[in-house]
């Protein structure tokens, strides 16, 4: 007789409990997010048996958290997100420092993973707001894609991220990219349009910081993306997107990539001061 072990966090729905293992009957099997885990005498281990279209459980939806800090249009993007998600969306607002805002988002989340939408992201209506991490046994973050309306790039910059709650709270040492400083997986699904070009300062600082990160990464894919940031632009404030990227590369070169100098780019106040020092004749709100 087969015995079934059911995760207490899982609500089973319409699963055929008369199913019997037919690959290796001496083993037990655990279904989890479309793959099978072998639960034999040596303990559970991953077995990549193809089991398509198995509907066996329902997990409660993950918390969705929206993070903003006074961005132009934040109210509209929050309203859209809540409408598309079809449920309440938690809102972290006005917390200084991206890493502090991420920790606050993790703190208020009641689920072990949560999906974070940054304030600049205009949520895509086709995004799966009921997304679940494919392997909850491995603590990592899942980075979606966002579409850049200025230069057409599509990758994880300014995209939604499915964060592991405990991993966020336990992250104290990190590099230029808080999220990528810990185990992560890229999920090439568009989560929205990154509307970072809503005003001059937001456009410039977003491009500046991303250019610093891409320059620091230095791999072929990052450098190709940097080339696009430096050369392509359309729509509102597109010139300041290119200028911001150019200024970011110049700053990286001027400080010889020194880590402590690059980490200053985390702070909005520093970015505004740096902008004023290199563009004294331009107002942060001019066009």
Segments (PLM) and residue ranges:
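N-terminal anchoring/stem segment of glycosyltransferases
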Residues: 3, 10-12, 22-24, 28-108
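Short glycine-/acidic-enriched loop or helix-start segments at secondary-structure transitions
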Residues: 15-16, 76, 125-128
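Short aromatic/hydrophobic "clamp" motif used to bind/position activated sugar donors
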Residues: 5, 114
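Short, glycine/charged-enriched secondary-structure capping and boundary segments
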Residues: 79-81, 129-132
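Catalytic-site signature of metal-activated, phosphate-bearing donor transferases
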Residues: 10-56, 131-287
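A short, conserved beta-strand element in the Rossmann-like catalytic core
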Residues: 9-13, 121-124
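Extended, charge-rich low-complexity interaction segments
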Residues: 117-130, 176
């Amino acid at each position: 007789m087969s015995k079934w072990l059911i995760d207490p966090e899982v609500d089973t729905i319409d699963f055929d409990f008369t199913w019997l293992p037919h690959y290796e009957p001496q083993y037990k099997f655990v279904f989890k997010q479309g793959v099978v885990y072998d639960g034999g005498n040596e303990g559970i281990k991953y077995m990549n048996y193809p089991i398509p279209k198995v509907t066996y459980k329902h997990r409660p939806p993950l918390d969705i958290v929206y993070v903003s800090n006074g961005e132009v249009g934040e109210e509209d993007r929050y309203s859209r997100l809540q409408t598309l998600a079809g449920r309440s969306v938690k809102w972290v607002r006005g917390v200084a420092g991206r890493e502090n805002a991420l920790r606050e988002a993790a703190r208020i989340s009641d689920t072990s993973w949560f999906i974070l939408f940054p304030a600049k992201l205009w949520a895509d209506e086709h995004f799966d707001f009921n997304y679940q991490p494919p392997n909850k046994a491995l603590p990592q973050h899942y980075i979606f894609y966002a579409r850049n309306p200025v230069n057409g790039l599509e990758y994880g910059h300014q995209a939604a991220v499915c964060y592991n709650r405990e991993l966020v709270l336990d992250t104290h040492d990190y590099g230029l990219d808080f999220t990528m400083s810990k185990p992560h997986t890229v999920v090439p699904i568009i989560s929205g349009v990154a509307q970072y070009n809503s005003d001059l300062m937001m456009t410039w600082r977003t491009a500046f910081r991303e250019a610093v990160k891409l320059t620091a990464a230095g791999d072929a894919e990052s450098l190709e993306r940097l080339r696009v940031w430096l050369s392509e632009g359309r729509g509102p404030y597109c010139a300041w997107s290119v200028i911001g990227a150019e200024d970011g590369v110049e700053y990286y070169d001027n400080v010889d990539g020194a880590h402590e100098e690059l980490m200053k780019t985390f702070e909005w106040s520093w970015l505004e001061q740096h902008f004023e020092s290199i563009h004294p004749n331009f107002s942060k709100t001019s066009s």
